[in-house]
Structure formats: C-alpha cells, structure tokens
Amino acid sequence: MAIREYLWVSLGGIVGACARYFLSRFTAKITGTSFPWGTLLINITGSFVLGLFLVYTTERVFVDPKWRLLIAIGFCGAYTTFSSYAYESMVYFQQGNWGLFAGNVLANNILCLAAVLGAGALVRSI
C-alpha cells in the first residue's frame, strides 16, 4: 500500500476510535455498567454502517477505493469492538454468570447480523 492509503485508513480510524470512546462513555452514563450496553450498541451500529456502505458501494454506485479505506477499514474497523465483546463475554463466563454470558453472545451475534442484513435490505429497497 502507498503511504496515502495508510493515511486514509488512519484518518478513518481516528474518527472511529473517538466515536467509539464517546458513545461507550455516554451509554455507560445512561445505562450503568452492569451489562456492556455500549459495546452492544457500537457493534450493532458499526455493523449497520458497514453493511449500508458496502452494499451501497458494491451494488449501487462506484466509489473511489479511498472511501472504502476511510470508512470500511478505518472508521468501522476502529469503531466496532469485537475484542471488547470477546473480553466481556470471557469475564461473564469465568464468573459463571451464564445469563449475562449468553445474553451478550446472543445479542451481539444476532443483532449485528440483523443490522448488516437490514442495511443491505434498506439499500436494495431504495
């Protein structure tokens, strides 16, 4: 990759990481920290944005590849939180908190998949 491509990914990553941090903190203030609602919200919205962007740009319009670097790889890559989701799930598992473990795993997998599918359906219906 050329240096310019790394810059597009980095720029998207900066914005995505900051958005993730802000939304995670904001959600924790509203919902508390007994369940990782911020991680779930971020994963769902990130999945939706990625699905919307990729379906739109592969099925509807051509975009310059730099936009995929910026949005799909940079922004969504830094914004979504699979590693946080995996860690939080492991903690619940190790604590024997089976309800929160199952709820976290199922909610992230089902709702994120639904967000991507919904975004694709939305783009195709427009």
Curated annotation (Swiss-Prot):
GO terms classed as biological process: cellular detoxification of fluoride
Membrane topology note: Multi-pass membrane protein
Inhibition and activation profile: Na(+) is not transported, but it plays an essential structural role and its presence is essential for fluoride channel function.
Protein name in the entry: Fluoride-specific ion channel FluC
GO CC, one annotated term: plasma membrane
Organism classification: Bacteria, Pseudomonadati, Acidobacteriota, Terriglobia, Terriglobales
GO MF annotations in UniProt: fluoride channel activity; metal ion binding
Keywords, ordered alphabetically: Cell inner membrane, Cell membrane, Ion channel, Ion transport, Membrane, Metal-binding, Sodium, Transmembrane, Transmembrane helix, Transport
Catalytic activity: fluoride(in) = fluoride(out)
Domain of life: Bacteria
Subcellular location as annotated: Cell inner membrane
Function, as annotated: Fluoride-specific ion channel. Important for reducing fluoride concentration in the cell, thus reducing its toxicity.
Regions crossing the membrane: 7-24, 35-55, 69-89, 98-118
InterPro entries on file: FluC
Residues the entry annotates as binding Na(+): 77, 80
Disulfide bonds: none
Pfam families to which the protein is assigned, alphabetical: CRCB
Species whose genome carries this gene: Koribacter versatilis (strain Ellin345)
Family to which the UniProt record says this protein belongs: Belongs to the fluoride channel Fluc/FEX (TC 1.A.43) family.
